[in-house]
From Swiss-Prot:
Species name: Escherichia coli (strain K12)
Recorded GO MF terms: ATP binding; CCA tRNA nucleotidyltransferase activity; sulfur carrier activity; sulfurtransferase activity; tRNA binding; tRNA-uracil-4 sulfurtransferase activity
SMART domains: THUMP
Disulfide bonds, paired cysteine numbers: 344-456
Name under which the protein is recorded: tRNA sulfurtransferase
PROSITE patterns cross-referenced by the UniProt entry: RHODANESE_3, THUMP
Pathway(s) it belongs to: Cofactor biosynthesis; thiamine diphosphate biosynthesis
Positions contributing to ATP binding: 183-184, 265, 287, 296
Domain (THUMP) ranges: 61-165
Active site annotation, chain numbering: 456
Length: 482
């Protein structure tokens, strides 16, 4: 089997040296991706296309599908490469190849020609088109919007009978631009923004801020691995997980409610910038869109950017949510995003949409920055190729109950402000308050002869914290969802 890879048009307008470099990198990327399907395949680069030849016919569909997902490819032609003698020979070979496809259809013939011949491309189109029209009674010629377009390519003494054309994702080959670090949460925005930078030629590493246990991290790892495996597997990348729970706890205890959102984002940018510097990455990528939430106003985004010299790229800055969701659907991350948890504990009641720099800096003076330094230092760096095995391991399941027994106690894990605004009272059972950000250090002080039913407003944080406690060896925890 043979495929002809056509380059993304922006590659073809580069200078000769840049174009050759891009083609060389794309050729290497294709080899890296396809070697898993057929180790004997050949990838040969030319000035305006790349040839892929493989022997294992059983891998035809898999190879074709993989090619459509490699950045830098405009479209793929599946071809049959045969010698020819003259125009009549071209017609006869085209008749054998296309007769069944043209029965009862309108068609036209389109020819591209390279080399020296005694005929032009239009001559071949007319001759082959006329012959097909005469020999297939139910077919008729239609030059605009036909049912079938017969694509032929003539190169010197070879004829390429094009059996199918398949669109690629375009963009630049990964590795032609510098590395970036994507702040990934597993939602719609961060997945799409990561894909957009891969498509633009960047090797995308991932940085995840874990706010609540293993279950969420496993979900985000699955998203990152999916994106890498589908669009970027030609290169090795990192998945860096930072336990941000201590940072969130410090913010909730010491920072004014209205400033929490902006300060949390500033802390994330500080942490990600340190990770980027550690690994020589040139820029951060976020999924922020202008005005989507309170921290994404121009004033707040400027304040967030000010905490670091690292370039922050926001490919979705002008996109609306519907457009982002449509893109997520196209690339296959929509289902992941819809089931990804949102946190009920890290939400300001009255977030500022126009933060003042002096106020933000005054609030940050209350923050213990040694906590931030520590979580960055302890960040977990994983080769994304190892994630497939890790995510297959079962997460410890935690029982969810809607009632309670005589030895049960409800543990309200909401933040202090939420508890004061909406105190939880349940008839017939004691309710104890312990904010989620103190569970890791204070849960062991509670009566371990009791069964603790964790509760929060949405049920997401309580489940994740229960999973975390189970991982720490506490088996006397359940999730309470009345």
């Amino acid at each position: 089997m043979k495929f002809i890879i056509k380059l993304f048009p922006e590659i073809t307008i580069k200078s000769q040296s840049v174009r050759l470099r891009f083609i060389k990198i794309l050729t290497g990327n294709i080899r890296n991706v396809l070697k898993h399907y057929d180790e004997t395949l050949a990838v040969v680069r030319h000035w305006d296309n790349i040839e892929v030849r493989a022997k294992d016919e059983n891998q035809r569909l898999a190879i074709r599908d993989a090619l459509t997902r490699i950045p830098g490819i405009h479209h793929i032609l599946e071809v049959e490469d045969v010698p020819f003698t003259d125009m009549h020979d071209i017609f006869e070979k085209a008749l054998v190849q296309y007769r069944d496809q043209l029965e009862g259809k309108t068609f036209c013939v389109r020819v591209k020609r390279r080399g020296k011949h005694d005929f032009s491309s239009i001559d071949v189109e007319r001759y082959v088109g006329g012959g097909l029209n005469q020999h297939i009674e139910s077919a008729r010629v239609k030059l605009t919007n036909p049912d079938v377009t017969v694509h032929l390519e003539v190169e010197d003494d070879r004829l390429l009978l094009i059996k199918g054309r398949y669109e690629g994702i375009g963009g630049f080959p990964i590795g032609t631009q510098e590395d970036v670090l994507s702040l990934i949460s597993g939602g719609f925005d961060s997945g799409v923004s990561s894909y957009m930078l891969m498509r633009r030629g960047c090797r995308v590493h991932y940085c995840f801020f874990n706010l609540g246990g293993a279950a969420h991290e496993i979900g985000v790892r699955q998203v990152a691995h999916y994106l890498w495996n589908r669009f970027g597997s030609s290169h090795r990348v990192r998945f860096v997980a930072i336990n941000f729970e201590p940072v969130v706890g410090e913010i909730l205890e010491k920072i004014d409610d209205g400033q929490m959102g902006v300060i949390l984002k500033r802390m994330m940018v500080r942490a990600a910038s340190k990770v980027a510097e550690r690994y020589g990455v040139q820029a951060l990528v976020t999924g922020e869109a202008l005005g989507q939430v309170s921290s994404q106003t121009l004033t707040n985004l400027r304040l967030i950017d000010n905490v670091s010299d690292t370039l922050i790229l926001r490919p979705l800055i002008s996109y609306d949510k519907e457009h982002i969701i449509n893109l997520a659907r196209q690339i296959g991350t929509e289902d992941f995003a819809r089931t990804m948890p949102e946190y009920c504990g890290v939400i300001s009641k009255s977030p500022t949409v126009k933060a003042v720099k002096s106020k933000i800096e005054a609030e940050e003076e209350k923050f213990d920055f040694s906590i931030l330094d520590k979580v960055v230092e302890e960040a977990n760096n994983v080769d994304i190729r190892e994630i497939a095995q890790q995510t297959e391991q079962e997460v410890v399941e935690v029982e969810t109950v809607n009632g309670f027994g005589p030895n049960d106690v409800i543990l309200d894990i909401r933040s202090i402000d939420e508890q004061e605004d909406k105190p939880l009272k349940v008839e017939g059972i004691d309710v104890v308050s312990l904010p989620f950000y103190k569970l890791s250090t204070k849960f062991g002080d509670l009566d371990q002869n009791k069964t603790w039913l964790l509760w929060c407003e949405r049920g997401v944080m309580s489940r994740l914290q229960a999973l975390y406690l189970r991982e720490q060896g506490f088996n006397n925890v359940k999730v309470y969802r009345p």
